[in-house]
Amino acid sequence: MQSKLVALLIIVLSFGGCTSKNSDENSSGKIKAAVSILPMKFIAEQIGGDKIDISVIIPNGSDPHTFDPSSKTIKKVHDSDVYFKIGGTFVFEKNIISDLQSNDISKFVDCSKGISFIENDPHIWLGMDESKIIASNIASKLIRIDSKNEQFYKSNLNIFNQKVDSLKSVVHERLSDLSNRKILVYHPAWRYFLSQFNLIEESVEKDGKHPKAGDLRQIINQSNEQNINAIFIEEQFNPDAAKSIAHELNIPIIKVNPLTENLFFEWNNFSVKIKERAN
């Protein structure tokens, strides 16, 4: 991985003298931004609107834990005016972006600034409160780059925050009377979201690995005692990984998408599915 990364970096830097970046910027008049995943694009679009063009580095349907970028993908980062990082321990950014950042630190914005991480869990975009902090960090950078449109970005940030708060109230009312506050997920991605509604995430995966037979038996026994009524698995994962648990507990496997293109939809969708299984 490291040898390939070095080769990619050499290829990227070799484009430096012949890139058409400046002509692209002048013709479009837009800020060229890059992000790691679709949810970050969603937040950035809410703030930047038609003032920015956004490249998503990890394609829809790919697993960020295993994604291996091409030289063309890395060049997108190189050619961008700004890269909105998730920050923290997000694996793709730790493995790839950190090396690129050393060449142009001013380009990279750590959107986790101001967020208190839960046990180094990188899935901050799924927390409704955390998404507002991410949006604020994006707005601050866009204002520094494009100060003449400061009010545009501030207004969009206000609108985004109001939408998040409004949906959060709906979700809170929907989930407030659940008798079972524990939610079983395959991959531990939802703590930021669930904790804001006093729900507890129980995960099958530990440290990115499927449990061994003894640990799996313990999870099944605990889930049975806790009256777990569903197992939620990410669309990017093979549902076969959860089948043995679902079969033993006689519960359904329900797909959710932490890498959604529309956070408003997925927050609402996940909460509806939790509520449906509670009835």
Residue ranges and their predicted role:
Residues 1-16:
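Sec-dependent bacterial lipoprotein signal peptides
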Residues 18-279:
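Extracytoplasmic metal-acquisition and chelation regions
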